[in-house]
Curated annotation (Swiss-Prot):
EC number(s) given by UniProt: 7.-.-.-
Gene: rnfG
Name this protein carries in UniProt: Ion-translocating oxidoreductase complex subunit G
Keyword Transmembrane helix on entry: yes
NCBIfam families the UniProt entry points to: PRK01908.1, rnfG
GO MF annotation list: electron transfer activity; FMN binding
Transmembrane segments: 9-29
Presence of keyword Protein biosynthesis: no
PANTHER family: ION-TRANSLOCATING OXIDOREDUCTASE COMPLEX SUBUNIT G (PTHR36118:SF1)
Free-text function comment from the UniProt entry: Part of a membrane-bound complex that couples electron transfer with translocation of ions across the membrane.
Membrane topology value: Single-pass membrane protein
Species this protein is from: Photorhabdus laumondii subsp. laumondii (strain DSM 15139 / CIP 105565 / TT01)
Entry similarity comment: Belongs to the RnfG family.
SMART domains xrefs: FMN_bind
Length: 209
């Protein structure tokens, strides 16, 4: 009887060890796959705001943290630097439009250092479905209107929605959302023009504790 119980105990222990080991292996493989997919999605997002033909460096690994009121709050924002033949040519910068209709709108703005916007994407928002959510590419192509636009002065009156005398369309029944995005992209593109002179002093994302 004791021998039988001992054998059963050993069998259960071996089974438990095998199960634990298998679970650990599966979790490890799953985490690796999830991380790889996240990296691919992030690279795809960066390529939507900075055309890949413009740079030849590993843009995801050339990440810096910047703080500026122009970016919508006093929190660190990630900046991804694009280089061509070693020379900085553009950057993708996280930015916040704090004055959306339903709260802050998170953006990723790509621009060169002369004020030309290369692309903009909304990464997070809580705007009203059917109204303010037209800032999403899956809803409309409105956000693409920024590509190719240039801003060199904070006093450029073209950089406003049409209701405010500018050139950007607002949405029917929703002016606050596009106004917030236009103003945020404008501030971010202007701020990016100051980056080259401060590159040597920027904090690497990897240095953040």
């Amino acid at each position: 009887m004791l021998e039988t119980m001992r054998r059963h105990g050993i069998t259960l222990a071996i089974f438990a060890a095998l199960t634990t080991g298998l679970t650990a292996v599966v979790n490890s493989l799953t985490k690796s796959t999830i991380a790889e997919q996240a990296a691919l999605q992030h690279k795809s997002l960066l390529d939507q705001v900075i055309p890949p033909a413009l740079y030849d460096n590993d843009i995801q690994n050339e990440c810096y943290l910047v703080n500026a009121n122009a970016l919508g709050n006093n929190l660190p924002h990630r900046l991804y630097l694009a280089r061509k033949n070693g020379h900085p040519v553009a950057a993708a910068l996280e930015s916040t439009a704090p004055d959306g209709y339903s709260g802050a709108i998170q953006l990723l703005v790509g621009a060169d250092f002369s004020g030309k916007v290369l692309g903009v994407r909304v990464t997070e928002h809580h705007e009203t479905p059917g109204l303010g959510d037209k800032i999403e590419t899956r809803i409309s192509n409105w956000i693409n209107v920024f590509s190719g636009k240039t801003i060199t002065s904070n006093h450029d009156q073209h950089w406003a929605v049409k209701k405010d005398g500018g050139e950007f369309d607002q949405f029917t029944g929703a002016t606050i959302t596009p106004r917030a995005v236009v103003n945020s992209v404008k501030r971010t593109a202007l701020y990016l023009q100051t980056i080259p002179e401060h590159l040597s002093s920027l904090e690497s994302c990897g240095e953040k504790s």
